[in-house]
């Protein structure tokens, strides 16, 4: 599960971010532009509820629209995290999304699931209606 946060949407980075995942060879299975309410944001970030930055994070996520996405492909969670970069943009390498587009940890452009199990939970939360089932005609060009 990948979410472009309000700063990424406001700054017009949606196309660039989608392009990076597509160019890597991943398939887009779900996409929605949505503004979430506080209760939904709190549910999404429930694992961080005891952290001192929790309320600020929730306020930030509800401050504008986000783009929620589901990507599929071999190693998509681990590779997605590498494409995104470190949580703290100052620790992110150039060439990563956060390394190229973010400065502050509190405005780091994008969220990516940290594990396959987290991705399953987040996809169920954000896409209760399910995702598109299709396979790119380029699949055989990307995978053995």
UniProtKB/Swiss-Prot annotation:
Cofactor(s) recorded in Swiss-Prot or TrEMBL: Mg(2+)
PROSITE patterns named among the record's database cross-references: NDPK, NDPK_LIKE
Keywords: ATP-binding, Kinase, Magnesium, Metal-binding, Nucleotide metabolism, Nucleotide-binding, Phosphoprotein, Transferase
EC number(s) given by UniProt: 2.7.4.6
Gene3D superfamilies: Nucleoside diphosphate kinase-like domain
UniProt-listed InterPro entries: NDK-like_dom, NDK-like_dom_sf, Nucleoside_diP_kinase, Nucleoside_diP_kinase_AS
Gene Ontology biological-process entries: CTP biosynthetic process; GTP biosynthetic process; UTP biosynthetic process
Catalytic activity from the UniProt record: a 2'-deoxyribonucleoside 5'-diphosphate + ATP = a 2'-deoxyribonucleoside 5'-triphosphate + ADP; a ribonucleoside 5'-diphosphate + ATP = a ribonucleoside 5'-triphosphate + ADP
Protein residues bound to ATP: 5, 53, 81, 87, 98, 108
A UniProt-annotated Pfam family: NDK
Root EC class: transferase
GO terms of molecular function: ATP binding; metal ion binding; nucleoside diphosphate kinase activity
SMART domains per record: NDK
Record-annotated active site: 111 (pros-phosphohistidine intermediate)
Disulfide bonds: none
UniProt record similarity statement: Belongs to the NDK family.
Function: Major role in the synthesis of nucleoside triphosphates other than ATP. The ATP gamma phosphate is transferred to the NDP beta phosphate via a ping-pong mechanism, using a phosphorylated active-site intermediate.
Name assigned to this protein: Nucleoside diphosphate kinase
């Amino acid at each position: 599960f990948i979410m472009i946060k309000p700063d990424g949407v406001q700054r017009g980075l949606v196309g660039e971010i989608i392009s990076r995942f597509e160019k890597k060879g991943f398939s887009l299975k779900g996409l929605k532009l949505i503004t979430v309410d506080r209760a939904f944001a709190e549910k999404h970030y429930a694992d961080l509820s005891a952290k001192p930055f929790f309320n600020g994070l929730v306020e930030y996520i509800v401050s504008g629209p986000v783009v929620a996405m589901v990507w599929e492909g071999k190693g998509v969670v681990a590779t997605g995290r590498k494409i995104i970069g470190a949580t703290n943009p100052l620790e992110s390498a150039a060439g990563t999304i956060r390394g190229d587009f973010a400065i502050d940890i509190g405005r780091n452009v994008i969220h990516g699931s940290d594990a396959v199990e987290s991705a399953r939970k987040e996809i169920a939360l954000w896409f209760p209606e399910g995702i598109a089932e299709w396979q790119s005609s380029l699949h055989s060009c990307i995978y053995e």
